[in-house]
Every structure is written in structure tokens, then in C-alpha cells.
Amino acid sequence: MPEVSEMVWNDFFSHFSLNADGSRSYDGVQVKRNAVFADTKGHWAQNAIENTVAEGLFSGVTDTSFAPNTSATRGMLMTVLARYAGTDTTGGATWYEKGMEWAKTNGVSDGTNPNADITREQLVTMLYRYAGSPTANGKLDNFSDSASVSSYAENAMQWAVANGIVNGSNGKLNPQNNATRAEVAAILMRFCEMSK
């Protein structure tokens, strides 16, 4: 059985599938759920990275590197959420095509700019839509940059704060900042725990 860390990121999305029993496969071979990346040891998000990789939601950019501080893309999140929903994301003209189709069909994203870096507020908004756009009752005024949250993302950010999905950093939400792969892993892990 290959380990998740043995899969190369660029090829991963075109070969990955979710089995009916919840296990993951790579080219039809069940994936062993452990990964060790040289660049995540001691990283603040190491646990979240290991958990999301173990769940088959993420893979490394190489067999030994996760690139935790690299920006995530919109297509990446669409694909990860499609996979989390149990959708087979293999095939398609691009690695993100099946995830993008799923995101558009399910109202999670309009499918635009899949290769663009995803901002923190875009990330939270996609998660919020995935969750069914529940009532938002969190307060953002404890964060010094709350006024920089775009109007389209306000309810999503309030919901994410209220549910502990987003905690901010140094009293800021940084909604306009690009989300790193580590931040996506951490936010996604909290979202998955909340969704159980």
C-alpha cells in the first residue's frame, strides 16, 4: 500500500478517490493513512496537517514536503471539500475539474479563478456555504481588523468565529490575506471536528 506521503501533489488529484466505506484510494489501491513531511516537524499546524493528510483530504507537494507556508488555491479547496463530501474527484481535464463542478453544483463556489490563491474570507465563505449557510451569531468586534471583512463574507466569518473554526492571530482575522496550506489544514480540521 502506498503512503499518502509517497504521492506527488500535482498527480494526486487526478488519481485519488473516496471509497464507499470512507477509506481513500490512489489509482485503486487503498491509501495507508500516515505521512511524515520534513517541513512540518515542529510547525504550529503539524497536528492539523497530519490529520487532514491522514483523512486523505490533502497530500504533500512531494513525497517529503507539504509546503505549509505556500498559499492554497480556490481549486484546491473546491477539490478538498468535494472529497470531504464523498465525491470522486478523479478524471477531468484538470486536477480540480471534478471538485470545481461539485462546488458549482452544490452552491459552494461559483467555480471562478480555480488557480488563484484563496483568501481567508473566501475559505471561510466556502465552508459556510458547504455547511448550508447556518445562522451567524458570532461577534467580530473583538478583532481589530473586523472592518476589513468584505460584506459578502460577514455572515460566514461570524459563523466561523462563533463555532471556533477561525480564531484569528494576534487579535486579527486577516480576511484579505491569502490562506496558506497550513491555515487551510487547521481551519478544515476544526470544521471537520465541528461537523461530527
Predicted regions and their residues:
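Extracellular, surface-exposed repeat/solenoid domains
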Residues: 1-3
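Feature responds to low-complexity, polar/acidic, surface-exposed segments characteristic
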Residues: 8, 12-46, 59-121, 127-153, ...
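Extracellular/luminal Pro/Thr/Ser-rich low-complexity repeat and linker "mucin-like" segments
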Residues: 44-54
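Phosphate/pyrophosphate-binding loop motifs in nucleotide- or prenyl diphosphate-using proteins
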Residues: 56, 164
